[in-house]
């Protein structure tokens, strides 16, 4: 049958054990009791607490214990030693279907793997240039380590200073956004520190606002240890998660009254993540990346997405092992081994999803280049961005048809 790789099953078991913790106040399902509104009467609070406690103890914990026991005694011994789904009897066909679903293209795993290798080589060359520019003598791998630990890139003493730095980035790009975008969202935007209860495990992320404007879009930044916070990728991160990345794209889609609801709230990762990754390349046009370390941060994030093309296809169509994928990543990017291991296991668990970012970015960049070449002096970057954003997410083939039609009109 189709079972998870052993290395993933091992990671799942403690999660079920945690959900079955006998210490009721530490149980996730008890959290609602801790945040009951002050307006509730003492009697109501007492009644709800008793009912929640009984439900958790009598219904939920026994089921989680049962599931954890099944995973340990039955599922783990039957889990597979291979890392990718290509090893399953129907795995190659299944992976090809996932690739089509996540990239919204007809590209094959072999084509994507080759594209990834070429992009990794190109970006390695760009990273070497930055390394030489700052006068670092040593290998690129040594430079990765140097950047990760450089004290000047960890200047913050208070979490508020991290948020203030993002506000500063926002103030730098604000005057330049109008030069690239005529179509901009009305939804308000805020930068906030990630809430304490999830900060230790969260990534920086964008949380979309309400379509009616009642709630702003929020860029959340986790700062679990401010003294260890490295700022070298912050300019790039802001463009991707906030403006003009996810905040622009998602807000414009939700605000678009001409779209039916199923399209206002729809999502195609190749388009949505492709757009966010494309906006990282706009940094210089928006007044950023003047510091070589910030530019290196952009290259590092793009490299991370290029590596995904290689390792995802390697794992699921070429028989790569988990260890092989980790080794390839460690040799080509500045992430820690712990972070890379988590990423590789994510690719093992969700085949094809990690391909969407880079495939989408490259398609949008290719369409921009095509429009510039065919339209010449008639090309208007603001109009190009409007055409890409105005109809919301869609498969990349449809986006290409839309841009081709716009080019033909001119």
Tell where the protein language model's regions lie, with residue ranges.
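N-terminal maturation segment of proteins
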Residues: 1-410
